[in-house]
């Protein structure tokens, strides 16, 4: 509710400002009446809100007057209640409005006037102060409200006087409904007349700041206030002693009752009775008593009958004095806060002034804009009239142009008929020419179709020729593969023939050696039998002959087993050779097929270009095959050279013989066990050569996994050297044929039986070594 009241007051305030600046007097009065009614409603409901609102809307000049008028009142009237507001309202209703030339009352006059009516209201119940001299909590609250209403009454009286005076000076007589407790600051600000009050005719008036509590009035001020003709001109006996009522606010309720009795006696008699001497001695009225009262006061002080009552009253006065001092301090603090509020009000008024100036500038700008709009509107009207005239001229021109166009169209229709006849004749001729051209086009289309069919036939013939060429190339490739196979088979056959020749030579040598050994053994037997028969010991030669025959039988069995192993390894070699050859043939055919598929799937943009490209690709393939054949032939020659070098190296190193024990006559020779153990000799060959040389060894070990070698591994000096194609394997330092020869039979003649057995063992081991060398050569 407080916010709504403030907002409504602000809106009314702005409206009244605008009306004061730009409106007429009747509307201004109406708005002022509305504001006064609204503020009256706020004073009736809010209590203490209306005086603050009246203070906030006063002008800076009025705020200076109100700073003097808002002196904190003493709170000695505990007996005053809510009736003060009614008394003030009745006071302002009964008070006649001052005329146009009447001067405003001073602060002391207005305060004395309000205190008089407050004292009249309090006179009906003088026993309230006797019942509760110290003041209960409810009584103190009523005293605060009474003092607040009293201060608000002073402010209202001054604001009403200022408002009425400003309205009269502006030439407007204020209506009766505007005499309320609130004013408007714009009236005081717009007031530019003479000051509110001039000095009286009797002399200058000493009108200083409002008295602060405790206040002591000087004697000459009291005499001037009493002898002031304005108090006597009021027509009421209560204004003759205004200074007594001014100081009633500083006297406690007990003295207020005595003062009221004193005033009553003073009004009824010319020489009033004096007040109590103790009260005048200790209260603030002791310095303000008139000279006519001093004699009765001194006479009253000499009486000793009421001493105890006076002492009690003096204690009560002292207590009230202390309480009033505390109230005075509190009221001084309130005065400081009200001064701060007044400063804020001044700032607010300056802000309102700035806003009003801004509003004036806006109104000037709006007036300029309206003038500019008016000129632009006039200009637009003239432009519209000009455009309407121009549009009228254009319509007339359009009508004349339409008339001319209609006449021209009639003439054009007459000429167009002649043109149509000519065009019909020309179209007939063009149709005949078109039919002739269509016949020629049909003939050309037939010729084009014939040429297309001929081209298709040629393309088919070209495709057939290309297919025949591709088939011929495939056949040529197959024949070349067959030729390569034949060449490889011939080379293998040559190698086999060489191996067979070597084997035959070895067999011949072995046969001759065995025959020689047999002859030597027989000769030894005969020689051994002859000395035995002569000596008569026939048991030992028979035993030696039996032993030798058994050894011979064992050797023959070993030889037969080795021969069987040799034939077996020859068969395996041939099988591996054939399988390797077939794998190479399959790889060659797969490469040829891949080349043919690439050639077939290659794009052929045109028949002639495809035929030429086919020829070129065929030539390239022939060249590639020739280069491949040359490379293979070079590899074969290189391998043959390596084989020859290895053979020569094996012949150069005759001193390296391999010793190894014989195993039972089974299948696998000891060569491959030695190859598995002696891997140090492979360091001189490349990785590819090692792989090709290891292939047959892996095959043989896979085929015979269950066979266990019995022969011990050869020493590290014995190492295999394989050829580049992996077709043959030879030991690094093979023994020469001379090392394989048996010892001479003559050397065994003079030896004993043990020596002969050792020699036979050595011969057998040499034979086994020769057989292993032969098997390696064959492999």
UniProtKB/Swiss-Prot annotation:
Main location (coarse class): other
Residues the UniProt record annotates as site (Required for interaction with MAGI1 and ACTB): 107
Site entry: Required for interaction with YAP1 and ubiquitination at K-347 and K-408: 213
Pfam families to which the protein is assigned, alphabetical: Angiomotin_C
Region annotation (Required for interaction with CDH1) ranges: 220-307
Effect of residue 408 to R: Abolishes monoubiquitination by WWP1 and reduces interaction with LATS2 and YAP1
Numbered residues of crosslink Glycyl lysine isopeptide (Lys-Gly) (interchain with G-Cter in ubiquitin): 347, 408
Modifications the protein undergoes after translation, according to the UniProt entry: Monoubiquitinated at Lys-347 and Lys-408 by Crumbs complex-bound WWP1. De-ubiquitinated at Lys-347 and Lys-408 by USP9X; the interaction may be promoted by cell contact inhibition. Deubiquitination of AMOTL2 negatively regulates Hippo signaling activation. Phosphorylation at Tyr-107 is necessary for efficient binding to SRC and synergistically functioning with SRC to activate the downstream MAPK pathway.
GO cellular component labels: bicellular tight junction; cell junction; cell projection; cytoplasm; cytoplasmic vesicle; cytosol; plasma membrane; podosome
Family the UniProt entry places it in: Belongs to the angiomotin family.
Designated name of the protein: Angiomotin-like protein 2
Protein source organism: Homo sapiens (Human)
Gene: AMOTL2
